[in-house]
């Protein structure tokens, strides 16, 4: 399978990049794409940068230039479910924007006009990710809603509003929904797999930086194991 992998920050892509065999690089619009073999698949890896605009551009370039069969977004997130701890993993069943509000025109909270309210991850990718993580790790793994916004969620007022708007949200981050929206538009299956670097309402920039490496190691490990399983999956 031809798989595209996107991570926002250097620690989130470094481990995967170093594990690739016969890597080749291509730079487009300031983004460096690494193509090679990883766990029995052809893989193209890119560090998108942080936020929705950067990740949208990176995803568009990835799909347009490399035509992956699917896209995996990996990296860290802030946990919203109270049962989650640092290092635990959330797999997206659906991804939504938490910082979009066009409800004045009849749209759902988080819904971009002319787009679905949420973007569903491909069920085969979700199932494969869930099975993989259960086999290789004893960390808690939840499957459900991940929300995205251009906000580092450490303000209690913003956190409570997000909880009110999206009561089933398991985790929050800054790229997944824009990647998902781009994949939806360009008809490419996707899944988001995030390891918790902090827990919303408890985190600070210091705690995020402290646990980012742990989250990056965990998420990279999950992606490699998922790639091994994808050799037998047909989308």
Curated annotation (Swiss-Prot):
* Keyword Chloroplast recorded: no
So where's the catalytic machinery, residue-wise? 12 (proton acceptor), 198 (proton donor)
Query: Can you say what this protein is called?
Result: 5'-methylthioadenosine/S-adenosylhomocysteine nucleosidase
Q: Disulfide pairs?
A: none
Under the heading InterPro entries, the entry gives: MTA_SAH_Nsdase, Nucleoside_phosphorylase_d, Nucleoside_phosphorylase_sf
Q: Which GO terms describe its cellular component?
A: cytosol
Tell me the GO molecular function terms.
adenosylhomocysteine nucleosidase activity; methylthioadenosine nucleosidase activity
Recite the lineage of the species.
Answer: Bacteria, Pseudomonadati, Pseudomonadota, Gammaproteobacteria, Alteromonadales
Q: Which residues bind substrate?
A: 78, 153, 174-175
**Enzymatic reactions:** S-adenosyl-L-homocysteine + H2O = S-(5-deoxy-D-ribos-5-yl)-L-homocysteine + adenine; S-methyl-5'-thioadenosine + H2O = 5-(methylsulfanyl)-D-ribose + adenine; 5'-deoxyadenosine + H2O = 5-deoxy-D-ribose + adenine
The family assignment reads:
Belongs to the PNP/UDP phosphorylase family. MtnN subfamily.
Species whose genome carries this gene? Pseudoalteromonas translucida (strain TAC 125)
């Amino acid at each position: 399978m031809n798989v595209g992998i996107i991570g926002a920050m250097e620690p989130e892509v470094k481990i995967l990049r170093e594990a690739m065999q016969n890597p080749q690089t291509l730079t487009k619009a300031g983004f460096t794409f690494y193509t090679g073999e990883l766990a029995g698949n052809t893989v193209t890896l890119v560090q998108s940068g942080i936020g929705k605009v950067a990740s949208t551009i990176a995803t568009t370039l990835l799909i347009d230039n490399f035509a992956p069969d699917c896209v995996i977004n990996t990296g860290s997130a802030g946990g919203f479910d109270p049962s989650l701890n640092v290092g635990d993993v959330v797999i997206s069943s659906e991804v939504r924007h938490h910082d979009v509000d066009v409800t004045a025109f009849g749209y759902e909270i988080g819904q971009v006009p002319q787009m679905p309210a949420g973007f569903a991850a491909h069920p085969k990718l979700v199932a494969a990710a869930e099975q993989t993580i259960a086999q290789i790790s004893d960390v808690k793994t939840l499957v459900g809603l991940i929300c995205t916004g251009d906000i580092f969620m450490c303000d209690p007022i913003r956190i409570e509003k997000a909880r009110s708007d999206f009561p089933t949200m398991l985790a929050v981050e800054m790229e997944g929904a824009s990647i998902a929206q781009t994949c939806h538009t360009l008809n490419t299956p996707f899944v988001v797999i995030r390891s918790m670097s902090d827990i919303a309402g408890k985190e600070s920039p210091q705690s995020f930086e402290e646990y980012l490496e742990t989250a990056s190691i965990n998420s990279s490990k999950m992606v490699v194991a998922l790639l091994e399983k994808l050799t037998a999956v047909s989308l």
